[in-house]
Amino acid sequence: EGVRKVCEWIWNGEIGEVRRVDTFTDRPIWPQGLARPEEDMRIPKTMNWDAFIGPAPYRPYNAAYTPWNFRGWWDFGTGALGDMACHILHPVFKGLKLGYPTKVEGSSTLLLNESAPSAQRVKFIFPARDNMPKVAMPEVEVHWYDGGLMPERPAGLPAGKNLNVSGGAAIFYGTKDTLICGCYGKDPYLVSGRVPEAPKVLREITESHQMDWVRACKEDADDRVLSASDFSEAGPFNEMVVMGVLAVRLQGLNQVLEWDGPNMRFTNIPDDAMIKTV
């Protein structure tokens, strides 16, 4: 519901043109910034360790990887950014009708070979998109922070107001107003205090998004109503998210990375480029 409201407010021109978005999460709440454990542990009888390893190179079992902490290890997860951006950046991607970023750069605390860093920031640049009837879609910068790093507080936000809602937030800076929503697009509001009355143009999901997906799966393909986040949207969106992860892992190149989305390649990394990690 929150994602729907964010989209409809932006598309109705309620906050004007958006040229910058700041986002953050309070994650990781699992260990990151770790070296590989040296101790080999007995595999639990209830676990298929080979299935867990999947396509990653084999390593001995250690309780540091499971059941919750896998997401912090590069072989099994994508860290706080990959874990939470799919929830926090969804209203950004959908509301601003984003596609492939053209430029991306990342930085972090100490970057290790084995696990994601303890804190990181990423900057994406997206080109202008087709204008909508009530609002233009100019080039926009999207900034991501995690691990305790935070964006600046928006001007006009009351002192003491906590930006963090359910694990993070997105801050849309428009030419008319500033829109803020929590993780999952939750509880959107305008810094001005005004409550928009935008027309409803997106289908309301009366049940959970999980069951909406099940419904779409069960419907006949000829007259199926697409789910709230169809693969045609979710696929490119997640490509954007892991592009941020890649920017952090390639920060040792010391350059802004230029991305050719349709051909899935960077255009400005020399063939002999080298990066260093610990």
Q: How would you describe each model-predicted region?
A:
Residues E1-N48:
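A contiguous active-site-proximal alpha/beta segment in oxidoreductase catalytic domains
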Residues V3, D26, Y58, T66-N69, ...:
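Active-site-proximal cap/loop segments of hydrolase catalytic domains
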Residues D22-T25, A56, S108:
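Residues that line or immediately flank small-molecule/substrate-binding pockets and catalytic motifs
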Residues W30-Q32, P60-N62, P151-P154, C181:
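Short, solvent-exposed loop/turn elements at domain surfaces
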Residues G33-R36, W68-T78:
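Flexible glycine/proline-enriched surface loops and loop-helix/loop-strand junctions
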Residues G79, H90:
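Substrate-binding clefts and catalytic carboxylate motifs of secreted carbohydrate-active enzymes
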Residues M84, L89, L96, Y100-V278:
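Glycine-enriched catalytic-core subsegment of oxygenase/oxidase enzymes
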